[in-house]
Amino acid sequence: MLIVLSASGAFAQVLATANSPEYKSILKMSASLFTRSTFQMGYERFLNPNNSVYLTAGLNFRDSDYEKEWGVRTEAQLRFHVFTVIKPKESNRLYFAPYLMNHYLETEGQSYDNNGAYSWNTDTFDAFGGGMLFGWSFSFANRINLDIYTGGGFRKTFNYNNTNSYNDNTVFDYGYSGIVPRLGIDIGFWF
């Protein structure tokens, strides 16, 4: 009995059922970067059942009384799906993915001197990074995909001149250089 169950589980990892058409592409939107004023879309294409390429592009925009931002963010990942279970109406995939990213940003913010007078300071910088992500991709209703990932890597920022005294140069600062954690959620659909 155990042999039959383990063999059927291995067979389910490789083949999709007749009720679940095998789509090869996913269009995604980043729900987690939306909280940082970034609209990011991504395209994942499966090269074979165990490997895919994921390319993303996003725009930053924020305009408030004290701060203005505009930027472009791009990223490329090569995903290795190490565990896959495909059922008629859902599928689960665990993966790891090395990534490379670039983030160009123009910022403008107010800074105050000792007398309470403020002035606008502008800054433009480029950030490059790379690292490793680990994630779980869950597909349901034959078309909807939920992708949750975590990981980290390095980030190096060029041309950043921090003149704002309120920035503490943590991983949440756009001009940060160093080791960065990553955590995110993408929502998409198969086609």
Model region roles, listed by residue range:
Residues 1-20:
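Cleavable N-terminal export/targeting peptides
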Residues 14-23, 49-50, 83-93, 140-146:
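Short loop/turn motifs that connect adjacent beta-strands in outer-membrane beta-barrel proteins
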Residues 20-22, 32-36, 65-73, 89-91, ...:
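Transmembrane beta-barrel outer-membrane domains
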Residues 25-29, 53-55, 74, 92-98, ...:
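Transmembrane beta-strands of outer-membrane beta-barrel proteins
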Residues 41, 76, 96, 132-134, ...:
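Membrane-embedded beta-strands of outer-membrane beta-barrel proteins
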Residues 58-69, 102-126, 157-176:
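Flexible, solvent-exposed loop segments that connect beta-strands
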Residues 75-80, 177-191:
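Outer-membrane beta-barrel "beta-signal"
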